[in-house]
């Protein structure tokens, strides 16, 4: 069982997007594609926290993920009546013919996958001529509690907090061959965050659970102590702004 299978049941509870945000992202994605009824593949679809909006609207959408548990969670969602088209496969070896899709969507996949060049090569291969490759991510307030605790956790683990270095490299790689690129912010929202909530999310996070169990326990205990000293209580709540960014790359050739 992969770490993503292990956390599939709780993934949406900790990382769901607001309904309005998912709907706004869908509108932005469809608005960026020239085809009237575009065929879209969502690579790293996970539990469908974004894909449900496409499925509910009856779009020509395919969700792909390596984790069987995540796809089962997607299929079991209560906010979709239609059966989603889901495929379990490695993103670096997509089971689709060349030029199969008008749009390819990649949302926060680089942190959980080695070999991003192979991923992008496959994404380009299945993209039709004139198609659009899209990179999406949720961005937290850099001064908010989540960002502060993430930086502290990185320091406790002896890491340099550069969470987007693979994504940045991927963006530069795509920009070098794309005929055009642009960035959109289709959704902004406010969310309540607490130190305790951050600890709960990270205790069940797929990336964090790849670390040795003893190291995870030690890091969370130290982070908990730091948070109490920094914020007074683990249940103190803060309101912060979040946004969804979408970077679009258009390719004259597939």
Stretches found by the model and what they are:
Residues 162-177:
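Short alpha-helix
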Residues 117-129:
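A short glycine-rich, Lys/Arg-flanked "PGG" loop and its adjoining helix->strand segment in the class I
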Residues 92-103:
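A short acidic, Gly/Pro-enriched loop at the edge of an enzyme's catalytic core
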Residues 39-93:
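Class I SAM-dependent methyltransferase SAM/SAH-binding core
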Residues 103-115:
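A short SAM/SAH-binding and catalytic strip from SAM-dependent methyltransferases
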Residues 1-35, 49, 53, 70-73, 132-163, ...:
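Conserved class I S-adenosyl-L-methionine
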Residues 47-49, 176-254:
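Conserved Class I S-adenosyl-L-methionine
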């Amino acid at each position: 069982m992969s770490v993503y299978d292990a956390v599939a049941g709780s993934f949406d509870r900790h990382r769901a997007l607001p309904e309005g945000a998912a709907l706004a992202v869908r509108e932005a994605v469809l608005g960026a594609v020239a085809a009237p009824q575009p065929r879209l593949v969502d690579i790293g679809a996970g539990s469908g926290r974004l894909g449900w909006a496409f499925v509910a609207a009856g779009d020509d959408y395919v969700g792909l993920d390596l984790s069987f548990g995540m796809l089962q969670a997607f299929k079991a969602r209560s906010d979709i009546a239609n059966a989603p088209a889901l495929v379990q496969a490695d993103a670096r070896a997509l089971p689709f013919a060349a030029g199969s899709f008008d749009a390819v969507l990649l949302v926060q996949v680089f942190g959980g996958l080695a070999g991003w060049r192979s991923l992008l090569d496959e994404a380009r291969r299945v993209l039709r001529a004139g198609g659009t490759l899209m990179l999406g991510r949720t961005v937290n307030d850099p001064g908010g509690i989540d960002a502060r605790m993430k930086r502290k956790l990185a320091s406790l683990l002896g890491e340099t907090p550069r969470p987007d270095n693979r994504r940045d490299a991927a963006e530069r790689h795509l920009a070098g061959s794309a005929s055009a690129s642009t960035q959109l912010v289709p959704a902004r929202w406010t969310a309540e965050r607490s130190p305790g909530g951050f600890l709960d999310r990270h205790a069940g996070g797929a990336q964090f659970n790849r670390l040795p169990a003893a190291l995870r326990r030690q890091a969370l205990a130290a982070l908990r102590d730091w948070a109490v000293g920094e914020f007074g209580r683990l249940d103190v709540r803060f309101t912060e702004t979040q946004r969804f960014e979408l970077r679009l790359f258009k390719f004259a050739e597939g």
